[in-house]
Amino acid sequence: MNSCDTKIFDYSSINSFLSENSIWIKNNPCISPDFCLDWVRFTEGLNGTPKLTEYSRSSFFSDYGEWSLVEDRWGDHAWRLRVSDGINEDFESLSNGFETEEYIYFPASFENLVRLKNLLQESDPETNAFPTSRANLGKSTLGIGARFTTLHWDGVDWAMSRLGMGLTANQNSIPRELVYDVNEMLAGNLDTVPFPFIGCDVPEGHQGQSVEGMTHGCILAKFKNGFHKLGISWSFNADHQPIGGKFDKREDQLVAGCMFASYITFDLSPELAETVIPESEEAKACFVDKEVPHDLVDAARKRVENAGLYPSEDEFNGLLAYVWPALQKMKVRDDKYKCFRKKHFSTDLGCDFLRELSIDELPGLTTPETTAVMLALSFEMGMPIHFVAPAFGFQKNIPYPDNH
């Protein structure tokens, strides 16, 4: 990881703000992407008699030695390494190491979380310390929305351990619930997000935690309680990733913040809500002929018919005109997810992610033909879909015909 890369993971502004206002991780986790706000204070404490909480279940081995997780009274965390005999202590693993007579301590920064993921997945491809897309997670899963953070993590881990089954153990809508960029939050630039289920707009990041912070805390919890030793794969869903509309300008930040998510929900509702379908049969045919590659049109038509659906040519052109702008933007976002992960993660396991196609925040019901065309295009465009969420016609707090 070079110096340019580390600037991406510089959260000094939010860490300074939290420290200056005595907002410590112990009582308010997951605001900062880092799980160590004051490394100087932490290391100064090591010079005396360290009063650290040691999480014995967090231990694991790598080629460098034995690692474990420790925490000070403010909630700042560190990775502690007992170096194996014969290992050169100048090895490049995590950053900002502080050496004592017995151990080397590294701050639990988000940058070091990236480094640790690479270190573990390179040395042990079967590790389940981090969210992945493997096992049956792409076929059947249960998404657990994370609303209570510290209460949530241990409860879900306990359930998975008893079931012997991996789940989508952390699920949040971003940027609606989690803060997509802590610097934008500090600058007062967070916007509002449509929330049709309750019939209004809501503030961005209204849960008050960053997507990176929630990711970090969820992973650390699995080390603390020893879940990483159980051999159970689990996933993290970045839910309702908005595609298009006013969210175009922040998509690079969404991509960066969700780099650990092994399950991405592509919410095409914002772009579809703004798309205007040509009115005449001729105009629809002209749009498709001009905008959509002919081989893609033919391949999509074949997939739709193989699903037992036979829209007329005009109906098919209308559907293509409706969904094509959103699918193009989805492809751009998908490529950005893949490129960002390839840049920062060193294994295929670390880069892979599941995809969900979502349009469930549009009013009304999604027709089978609309769903089929969108799925056909997604697969033909190199974006295999694992889950789909069509609009199902139910909106919270809005009268329904049979609601007596």
Stretches with model-predicted labels:
Residues M1-K343:
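Alpha/beta catalytic barrel-like cores
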